[in-house]
Amino acid sequence: MRRKIVVGNWKMNNSVAESVQLATDVLAALGEGFSGCEVGIAPTYLALDATEKVIAESEVQLVAQNCHYENDGAFTGEVSARMILAVGCSSVIIGHSERRQYFGETNATVNLRIKKALSEGLNVILCVGETLAERESGVMETVISSQVREGLDGIIDISAIVIAYEPVWAIGTGKTASSAQAEEVHLFIRTLVTGLYGQTASEKVRIQYGGSVKPSNAAELFAMPNIDGGLIGGASLNADDFAAIVKAASV
């Protein structure tokens, strides 16, 4: 049975002090109620070190929001996998739709970043998902298939990879794919993984849902057989809401 995983992506929110406070509040809100679920939080780069100190003695994992595909060099504004590993990150989010939309990330650069992160010993959350236009024009499966196949190109072992399905039209909009809609895509992704890596690997890979997950809909989403947790945006900025989502995944 796959252990569910819930990660709070704080995006470009919170100062270092605010991140420390939120991490403290998250630990308090979680209490002992998440033993059945893997939990991570992803603050900004600036707050990684300070946040790590707060969660160091807990089971909550430190996650980075991105990393570059080179170790160092003339890449102004970028941060390498080695750098985030050095401050205590165990995982990194790669290919988030906002990176693709606003910063020109492609399947090819996502693939490079994944390979570098894996080579440094990090776990990876690979984000895939379609826009509303792509869904309505009937190319959703083509888009997601390309993101999965090209993102994982040349990667033999996916045991350290989690896939996050994030319908772009549901991110930060308040709209949520129904549990049936989300399950349909998660099953499609798992079928893709079966074709690429075989049945055993596809049964083990965890596929998160990310798209306006809230305490009010988390339990229904997480009850679906192919939804293995969530990549949480806005709701992760409220400790009580995030804890409620984690507990819904811990049942």
UniProtKB/Swiss-Prot annotation:
UniProt key word Flavoprotein: no
Record-listed E.C. numbers: 5.3.1.1
Subcellular location, record wording: Cytoplasm
Catalytic activity: D-glyceraldehyde 3-phosphate = dihydroxyacetone phosphate
A Pfam match: TIM
Location of the active site: 96, 166
A cellular component annotation (GO) from this entry: cytosol
Principal subcellular localization: cytoplasm
InterPro entries: Aldolase_TIM, TIM_sf, TrioseP_Isoase_bac/euk, Triosephosphate_isomerase, Triosephosphate_isomerase_AS
Pathway: Carbohydrate biosynthesis; gluconeogenesis; Carbohydrate degradation; glycolysis; D-glyceraldehyde 3-phosphate from glycerone phosphate: step 1/1
Subunit structure: Homodimer.
Protein's job: Involved in the gluconeogenesis. Catalyzes stereospecifically the conversion of dihydroxyacetone phosphate (DHAP) to D-glyceraldehyde-3-phosphate (G3P).
Listed NCBIfam families: tim
Family affiliation: Belongs to the triosephosphate isomerase family.
Protein's name in the database: Triosephosphate isomerase
Taxonomic lineage from the root: Bacteria, Pseudomonadati, Chlorobiota, Chlorobiia, Chlorobiales
